[in-house]
Amino acid sequence: MFTDYGLNGPYVGQLHAVVAYVAPDAPAIDLMHDAPARDPFRSAYLLAALAAEMRPDSICLAVVDPGVGGDRPPIIVSVDGKRFVGPGNGLFEILQRRSSRAKAWSIDWRPEKLSSSFHGRDLFAPVAAMLARDEWPTCSPLGEGWREDPGRPGANWPDDLAEAIYIDGFGNVMTGLRAAGLSERAKIEVAGKLFSRARTFGDVAKSQGFWYENSLGLVEIAVNGGSAARQYGIEAGAPVALRN
């Protein structure tokens, strides 16, 4: 499960309750529930990075849905054997763009009771659980042209996002830039500060800031023994620049 619901309150528990009822034998894993709130744009880059570590037959219930109850379609996206269920608001744009084998379906199935404000519980969770039982709800294929439609949500988003997209509990600042291919000498500028590359925390002095390739393959700003976000005043959405 990947959502922006947060762990406080009743929302995540209700997702688990639905999945456990519909597919009691399917393990449900909380991937993260503090995705960028009401922000499918930045969440799309985070989800794409996390998806690379999922096993090929995974089913991911992913909900960052500020337009819940509106006209955005509910969809299933299959990417390299992994299936994602959630809103068609661009949340799956980056992961499908990075794959040569992506298909999508619009979900036609509807439950008897559908809250206008909680499609995660009433629509997406049951569909994800059905897929976990090898059952397909009523769907309509979006066809081969859906990936080329310039009007689809997220069509104009960049392949890599030069912004801070997530700040973890340690104050490390994850960006939407992939580290693969960047020079060892490349510097990252954010909040008016230039950061050099290091392999890991112990390679720099205490309280020193640096950037490194994190476990998801993204550029991350960190401080050895401290919080990069607090020390340098970096917030989610801060622009990031690559300097050679």
Language-model regions: role of each:
Residues 111-177, 181:
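Anionic-ligand-binding alpha/beta catalytic cores of soluble enzymes and soluble regulatory domains
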